[in-house]
């Protein structure tokens, strides 16, 4: 079995609740390991290890990529759907987390409140992984920056422009970009900006190595950027706001006109699912500069790297 980079040794047995749980060296080492796993030049053996999936929100890419990542490492997953477990009937997180710690080796949790995720981590004696909350989507951000690194061969000094709602994806892009020395420009209409506290955390993490900023005009957001990124305007749980958000985001569609304002080598990213004709045009998502499906594949590779690090012998 391959040996982990010494930079990742501190992650053994740890939780991954936020992008800011990593430092710069760990984030870079995870991306390198993910690239090696993707190329087949590294192999890890997690035979006999079990990852529990607790997903309170719908999922395609996150659920499948974690399941396949664990299988490729020799382990297995168990799907703990809230509707068919006592979680859905109100069993306290404290009880569920302690019991599952006796059965599983790690938990990947997709839920609404970051506080619930933190409760699982508090009570569990095994690693807990953020598979998406309303506040962050850190595994997605790792895949995003791996995709950017594949396109340009490096990360530091590049600019990623995100246009859309200042949501969980935007938060994790700011935090992870700050760690990796990537300038992250969030473009969003007034009233839809990211949480100021997350912006402050990202600026502190950047330490002058990257500029993390928010603008309220789409062309200003994307001008000269090396990656243009967007996401749905109404996230899960916000469906009742769809019509209002469509009005607010009129003019913010990532289309050919907006793409023309970016660096000529710019790549296009979207975490999916995409609503063609709303936040992104069909021509752009299917165009030559799109790396959307490479990005989706990279979820599996970064999560393999993460699982190998968290479940390494302590």
Report residues per predicted region.
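Positively charged, low-complexity intrinsically disordered leader regions
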Residues: 1-68, 136
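Phosphate/diphosphate ligand-binding glycine-rich loop within oxidoreductases
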Residues: 40, 46-149, 276
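Phosphate-coordination loops involved in phosphoryl transfer and adenosine-cofactor binding
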Residues: 46-51, 156-158, 265
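Glycine-rich phosphate/diphosphate-binding loop of Rossmann-like nucleotide-binding domains
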Residues: 56-69, 152-230
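Short, structured coil segments at secondary-structure junctions
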Residues: 73, 103, 123-125, 180, ...
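Rossmann-like adenosine-cofactor binding region
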Residues: 203-283
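Adenosine-phosphate binding glycine-rich loop
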Residues: 265-266, 271-314
